[in-house]
């Protein structure tokens, strides 16, 4: 699944199959998050609404890795103390607090981000979402067609932390947020043929030695990641992830995967491409992420 369950006492996490969806019910700041947990955790299932009254952009909640978006909590809690349910959205990010290879796209038709469910201090759950972000029924998931390949660029955001084995083999001892640039190549029939996720940056608080304080986002020691498509349905491509070479921990292809879907409107078919992914690394980490990208016309 594209979610992680984390235990506070053992500082370990496991992949979970949690069905999650986000309905965007207005032009801005209007969401309904619906989660369906496995049977053993069914008490945590349900729907949570978010409005502008739930904005929680303080203390770094709206920054994942180096990308800054919007964050919401219900109920709105001081300092992010449980219990709460939280949501982030990066369809219209402010900025990338690092050396960005390209500007963060301002997405018109799709939203993407993370969700978090914190019932108490003993355990917590994080997952990812993507979906129509135009607040209108005119968005379609049709594949674009063209005479040549198309390139999409954007960013991945997500959560990463120690896996179920953890211990000394894990690079991290707790769940952290990350972001990374992503570039995807689509063929003339509108199918993903390749993709690359570059340097993963981890949010590590603020540098208060300067004024105003700046975000600290060191690189995670993980090699760049490739998308390897293996199948498709009418409107969704899927596949595995693998390491692209270079220095850093590698990704286990057998337990990693992605899905991607186009978003657009009549006259602008397939202008945006979004999806979700998960991966496991050789340095004891598991991660879930979502991404949003936009078509980049050839120069």
Which residues fall in each region the model found?
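Mature soluble binding/inhibitory domains
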Residues: 1-299
């Amino acid at each position: 699944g594209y979610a992680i369950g984390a235990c506070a006492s053992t500082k370990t996490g496991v992949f979970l199959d949690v069905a999650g969806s986000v309905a965007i019910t207005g032009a801005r700041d209007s969401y309904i998050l619906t989660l369906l947990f496995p049977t053993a955790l069914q008490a945590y299932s349900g729907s949570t609404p978010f409005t502008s009254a739930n904005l929680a952009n303080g203390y770094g909640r709206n920054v994942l890795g180096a990308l800054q978006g919007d964050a919401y909590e219900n109920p709105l809690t001081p300092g992010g103390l449980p219990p709460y349910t939280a949501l982030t959205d990066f369809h219209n990010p402010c900025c990338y607090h690092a050396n960005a290879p390209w500007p963060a796209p301002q997405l018109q038709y799709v939203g993407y981000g993370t969700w978090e469910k914190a019932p108490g201090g003993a355990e917590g759950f994080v997952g990812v979402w993507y979906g129509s972000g135009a607040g209108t029924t005119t968005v379609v998931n049709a594949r674009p067609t063209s005479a040549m390949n198309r390139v999409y660029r954007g960013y991945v955001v997500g959560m990463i932390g120690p896996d179920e084995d953890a211990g000394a083999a894990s690079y991290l001892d707790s769940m952290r947020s990350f972001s990374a640039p992503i570039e995807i190549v689509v063929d003339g029939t509108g199918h993903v043929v390749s993709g690359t996720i570059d340097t993963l940056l981890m949010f590590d608080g603020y540098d208060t030695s300067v004024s105003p304080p700046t975000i600290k986002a060191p690189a995670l020691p993980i090699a760049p990641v490739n998308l390897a498509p293996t199948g498709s349905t009418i409107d969704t491509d899927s596949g595995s992830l693998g390491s692209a070479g270079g220095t850093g921990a590698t990704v286990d292809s057998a337990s990693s995967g992605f899905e991607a879907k186009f978003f657009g409107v009549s006259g602008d078919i397939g202008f945006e491409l979004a999806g979700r992914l998960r991966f496991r690394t050789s340095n004891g980490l598991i991660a879930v992420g979502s991404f949003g990208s936009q078509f980049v016309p050839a120069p």
